[in-house]
């Protein structure tokens, strides 16, 4: 459901997604669904991203578009500034320059209120958007694959953050949630 950015941040979010310049509606919908499943408070689509109400995006979200906070944002720089002012740490998903995700977790970075900044499917985040983040973080690739699909990388990052938030809140870090 559409919400203003101020309403999202006014509710003290712990986990937020910023989709910057995401163009593929299937990936965007899958990111929405993954964010919802990981317990994120909202997903922000930058002004240069695909329309989240594109029919392919809605289908790929499998209904999550209707029950996660959805912000139709403006310029990424303004969005990042607003989120930082609301107390969120902004992490840029970047496999080229980022510290490995498995090194960020033990430092406690992921347990803080976090906004994940994800870029375009084809070329990731440009340098000007990378510079907006508090730090770049990448999903390590142990095999021969060149990279991960946007939705796959988002899933790894969001679930790792969700686990860190649960552990930080005193929850059982190893508990398996009940399935539906």
Q: Where are the predicted features?
A:
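RNA substrate-binding interface of SAM-dependent RNA methyltransferases
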Residues: 2-98
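Structured adenosyl-cofactor binding patch, chiefly the S-adenosyl-L-methionine
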Residues: 34-38, 49-65, 127-180
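A broadly tuned preference for mixed-charge, low-complexity surface segments
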Residues: 72-80, 87-104, 141-148, 168-180
